[in-house]
């Protein structure tokens, strides 16, 4: 089981196949997605990778986080996430996962926060049919109708589908096909729509209900920084991290 990546939704466009058919795609940008830490069975009880993406200002990062980024020699990241992996799919700390981690033709699952719609009625929120346009109905054409309460049970049950806040929910869309990747610009083009607004953070991982293609790189496609070449942000974080107190000598 391989690691996923954190990407930023750019928007939607279309690409054309060799047969001249157009395919609607969502463009996802992977911006310096680096491995920040490992989770191991011995220390944490499970195996996972903590990855970060984007750049965060050092002043907006807590001292504890600065220390962790300094240990990993990674610039402070805007967004962090964990992905469960198998023990043979661990990627070195500090390595940058590139867009060609996924190959064209494979299927992925994407997770994002849906667009907020505010307070919505039952017809928009739950696809209710509403009431009749005439025949004695006035004013209440878009109402939900009866909520099911009568003398018994004498109340409306919890979780009844009613008007309320719509959107801003964590949603996973499964089995989206990867149409194209551009590792130089860090772009992944997936077929179809992806939940969330433009600029929102999206988690992309191998589809759990589809077999991983044999051509997919294991443990993943990544590039490592040169030895001793720590990012500038990591150096600033190390300088800002608190120093350990000096040990006192016994008299």
Swiss-Prot record:
The modification N5-methylglutamine is found at residue 151. Residues 140-162, 229-251 are annotated as: Disordered. GO terms for molecular function: rRNA binding; structural constituent of ribosome. GO terms for biological process: translation. InterPro entries: Ribosomal_uL3, Ribosomal_uL3_bac/org-type, Ribosomal_uL3_CS, Transl_B-barrel_sf. GO terms for cellular component: cytosolic large ribosomal subunit. Methylated by PrmB. The keyword Repeat does not apply. The keyword Nucleus does not apply. Keywords: Methylation, Ribonucleoprotein, Ribosomal protein, RNA-binding, rRNA-binding. It comes from the Bacteria. One of the primary rRNA binding proteins, it binds directly near the 3'-end of the 23S rRNA, where it nucleates assembly of the 50S subunit. NCBIfam families: L3_bact (TIGR03625). Belongs to the universal ribosomal protein uL3 family. Part of the 50S ribosomal subunit. Forms a cluster with proteins L14 and L19. This is Large ribosomal subunit protein uL3. It comes from Methylobacterium nodulans (strain LMG 21967 / CNCM I-2342 / ORS 2060).
